[in-house]
Curated annotation (Swiss-Prot):
Stated role: Endonuclease that specifically degrades the RNA of RNA-DNA hybrids.
Gene Ontology terms: cellular component: cytoplasm; ribonuclease H2 complex
UniProt protein name: Ribonuclease HII
Organism: Bordetella pertussis (strain Tohama I / ATCC BAA-589 / NCTC 13251)
EC number(s) from the headed UniProt entry: 3.1.26.4
EC class name: hydrolase
Gene3D superfamilies: Ribonuclease H-like superfamily/Ribonuclease H
Catalytic activity, reaction form: Endonucleolytic cleavage to 5'-phosphomonoester
One Pfam family cited in the UniProt record for this chain: RNase_HII
Binding residues for a divalent metal cation: 21-22, 113
Major subcellular site: cytoplasm
Entry similarity comment: Belongs to the RNase HII family.
Domain RNase H type-2: 15-201
């Protein structure tokens, strides 16, 4: 008895796939970032992993490789003002839309980390823990994270009293203590409950 050709019935994967991820949804300060990356299958980037498990030096080195070897990449953000007016989820989706729209080539499929994705002009697939499973999403997570970390160093230069270079805007005991001492700055997210608690107007 002839066996059916199961593989022949499967739809082929799109040729141009973008990985999409964000950085900075949880912090109390700074913009939320997103990146989109289309990797070159002929020039793979070794060592890709979820940005959260990599050391800062590893992330920076990989970011250089990704920017040099990817077919296309783009990093975008949504500002603190957009976060406060839209809410953090909508602002994150906006940053992702901007990242995909900024790519030099249009993807046929966007694979987005997590279980929520923005509306895009191409097909979209969400992937739980995609930053650890899909190389293009790992690459996007690294570019988003390194871009956001660089932005927090810029904020530290403007507002050194908050220690943004240490906690990157997250609600650490150090950050909360400095908030009590100084009150919030313009780059703190007024819509976040801890900032409201410290007297943000």
């Amino acid at each position: 008895m002839e066996q059916p050709d199961l593989f022949g019935t499967l739809a082929p994967l799109p040729a141009i796939i973008a990985g999409v991820d964000e950085a900075g949804r949880g912090p109390l300060a700074g913009a939320v970032y997103a990146a989109a990356v289309i990797l070159d299958p002929d020039r793979p980037v070794d060592g890709l992993a979820d940005s959260k498990v990599l050391k800062a030096e590893q992330r920076e080195a990989l970011a250089v490789q990704i920017r040099a070897q990817a077919l296309a990449w783009f990093v975008a953000s949504a500002s603190v003002q957009e976060i406060d007016s839209l809410n953090i989820l909508r602002a994150t989706m906006l940053a992702m839309q901007r990242a995909v729209a900024g790519l030099a080539m249009a993807p046929e499929l966007a694979m987005v980390d997590g279980n929520q994705a923005p509306k895009l002009r191409c097909a979209v697939q969400t992937v739980i823990k995609g930053d650890a499973l899909v190389p293009a999403i790992s690459a996007a997570s690294i570019l988003a994270k390194t871009a956001r970390d660089a932005d927090l160093l810029r904020l530290h230069a403007l507002y050194p009293q908050y220690g943004f270079d240490q906690h990157k805007g997250y609600g650490t005991p150090q950050h909360l203590s400095l908030l009590r001492e100084h009150g919030p700055c313009p780059e703190h997210r007024r819509s976040f409950a801890p900032i409201k608690a410290y007297g943000a107007p």
